[in-house]
Amino acid sequence: QLFSVGFRSPGGETIPRIPVSLTQEQRITFVLERTVIYVNYEVVQTTTGSQLILIRMLDPTPGIWTLQVYRAFPSPPDFHVWLPITGFSTSDVIFLEPDPYTTLTTPSATVPVLSPSTYQASNNSFSPESGRGFTRLGEIKPDFASPGISVTGPGPAGSYENRSGASASAAITSGAAAL
């Protein structure tokens, strides 16, 4: 599959299909908006062998943006879109109809990598923010669950503090694997 993209801004301005460029980042501007979009096409990504389209928006106009995906060949469309991880965009950037069951990305989505899910050990509940499988290729992931909510660990100056998230879960997983 080879895909290309276009956009519709909250104000209704449309950027038609942006042709695939193998060598350079494409800078897209709007007539009526201050938003600038950068599009990078990577036809064969080195880690997956699949196409990657990286989209970066500067000063996006608030509202609903539409991403239009075009395919080059007449076959069923099979693509996935992910938002940046927490902290790389504002919390009000969301998909209107997200799929919560294909959230893992590289490297956790690759077969030889062990991918833990994060859970709260005190009540055995999974973290809603934890990545979930299947992968985009249908592999079953995560491989197991590891504590990652309110995990006590070393802090500054010999103190201890609680941490939560995938990093805490990964630290416990790494320690267990080292044993």
Model feature map: region roles:
Residues 1-179:
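Loop-rich non-cytosolic ectodomains and luminal regions
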